[in-house]
């Protein structure tokens, strides 16, 4: 219907990416933990396809929208029941740290991010908070994929839009679901910096 109505390839790809992002935003924590990978794959595929359609729209790539839509449709059971997204009033991004520090902060992380943006908060500050979590934790490749895709897709919508808020709230939920980690990465970075300076890591007795 959208194609017949004259939607552009970019618009089709952006709509698909939004639908895939909402699978993360509405992912209920009662699902198996491994199912986060299912919604992650659908979203990152849709983001990659959208970026390709922006650069080089073609009939073959538009066909990929159909494949992606089928994937999003097949993942619908992961949103039954759908997680409720309640905006946290007077949201403070510093409160996200508590969501990274303890298990069970998935819904609160989404509410903080959503509340921050819907109340006029600066999108770039939320993105910075998500980036800080990537650096502070032992982030996996999927984490970087989800955050990168969320930032790109949120930027595809007007600043202050509902769509952008929902997308970034989903990214916050995804990170909260996978934290805390052992947080060995900062130690590795500090060790690498010391080695680069030529410091002695161990002293012989």
Predicted feature residues:
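Mature, well-folded catalytic/scaffold domains that follow N-terminal targeting or propeptide regions
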Residues: 1-205
